[in-house]
Amino acid sequence: MIKLIVGLGNPGPQYAVTRHNAGFMIVDNLAVKLGVNFNAYKNLGEYVKTTIGGQDVFLAKPLTFMNLSGRMVTHLAGFYKIKPQEILVCFDDISINLGAVRIRKDGSAGGQNGMKNIIELFGTQDIPRLRFGVGPKPERFDSADYVLSKFSKSDEKLLNESIEAAVEAAESCVKDGLERAMNKFNK
């Protein structure tokens, strides 16, 4: 059962609408849908306790920059006695086409440094994740430059629709369980 949904991103207005902040966008939109506001958490990020489908769940956004995301996630999970298998980490993935959603129970970080840090600090790859497609990366772009670039105007409609689908997928992971959510959203 998912007890903590984490959105990965970078703090600061200069990163607000970049591909690397897709995780923040998902969790922010979920918070709006649920009518809750984030609170500061130990200078490491923001979080809020809420309910989805009658189940208590935390939403969290580490504000330590992407590469140090695990600091907040492991601290929050330890404090509330949440196992790595009960966490859903939402993040961008340049290997997936823009707007596609992929849910996995476990696996490697796949080159995503925030997820890599979380895996390292927990000492396990057994952490569910929701990967949000921000690709494909054009040949002329360096990966780091691409994920830190803003979405184009032409991508905005698809982005908004896809973020809503990702919010539904995250809710489904809590309400229906990972297997059913994967069957519904992994296409």
UniProtKB/Swiss-Prot annotation:
Q: Which residues act catalytically here? A: 20 (proton acceptor)
Cite the position(s) of the site with description Stabilizes the basic form of H active site to accept a proton.
Answer: 92
Q: Does the keyword Ribosomal protein apply?
A: no
Q: Which GO terms describe its cellular component?
A: cytoplasm
Top-rank taxon: Bacteria
Under Enzyme Commission nomenclature, its number is 3.1.1.29
Chief site of localization: cytoplasm
Which residues carry the site feature described as Discriminates between blocked and unblocked aminoacyl-tRNA? 10
Mind telling me which Gene3D superfamilies this protein's record contains? Peptidyl-tRNA hydrolase
Query: What disulfide bonds does the UniProt entry report for this chain?
Result: none
Q: Where in the cell is it found?
A: Cytoplasm
Q: Which residues bind tRNA?
A: 15, 65, 67, 113
The protein's GO terms of the molecular function aspect are: peptidyl-tRNA hydrolase activity; tRNA binding
An example of a Pfam family matching this protein is Pept_tRNA_hydro
Protein's GO biological process: protein quality control for misfolded or incompletely synthesized proteins; rescue of stalled ribosome
InterPro entries annotated for this entry? Pept_tRNA_hydro, Pept_tRNA_hydro_CS, Pept_tRNA_hydro_sf
**Catalysed reactions, as listed in the record:** an N-acyl-L-alpha-aminoacyl-tRNA + H2O = an N-acyl-L-amino acid + a tRNA + H(+)
Role summary: Hydrolyzes ribosome-free peptidyl-tRNAs (with 1 or more amino acids incorporated), which drop off the ribosome during protein synthesis, or as a result of ribosome stalling.
Xref: PANTHER family = PEPTIDYL-TRNA HYDROLASE
Tell me the subunit arrangement: Monomer.
In the record, the note on similarity to other proteins reads: Belongs to the PTH family.
Q: What is this protein called?
A: Peptidyl-tRNA hydrolase
- Which species is the source of this protein? Elusimicrobium minutum (strain Pei191)
Q: Which gene encodes it?
A: pth
